[in-house]
């Protein structure tokens, strides 16, 4: 069998292109305009496990893309967790009910509601159901 150098080159190029395509598939739909404006389809974001059972999240912008503000999606599933915020945070509830407990009081939000939590707040994030919300934090390097 006589295999030409050109055929080998074509095969190698095709394999490399297919491999690169598999490895570079975006995790979710995000469009970055040359102006710096970013559009994200939140319904395509798949959250990953975070710190404890029933808590998942996914940062949707990098520090390079948005150096001053962070943004992501968090999912809570019939759970609660405690934390003290070292950043300012806005939460926009997408699905379910988000409850923020502070000093024995509860601030609650449903789909379309926004909750602001100031830096230094010692709170419990909790939910009686499965909740999905977008978070917006300042500064961007919140973890």
What annotation goes with each model-predicted range?
Residues 77, 101-105, 128:
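Short strand-coil-strand connectors
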Residues 119-143:
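Ligand-binding loop in jelly-roll beta-barrel domains
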Residues 75-76, 85-101:
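Short, conserved beta-strand element in jelly-roll/cupin
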Residues 12-70:
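A short, N-terminal "cap"/entry segment at the start of jelly-roll beta-barrel domains
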Residues 55-85, 118-119, 141-142:
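Conserved short histidine dyad/triad with adjacent acidic residue
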Residues 1-6:
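Intrinsically disordered, low-complexity regulatory segments in eukaryotic proteins
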Residues 103-120:
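Short acidic-glycine-tyrosine-enriched beta hairpin
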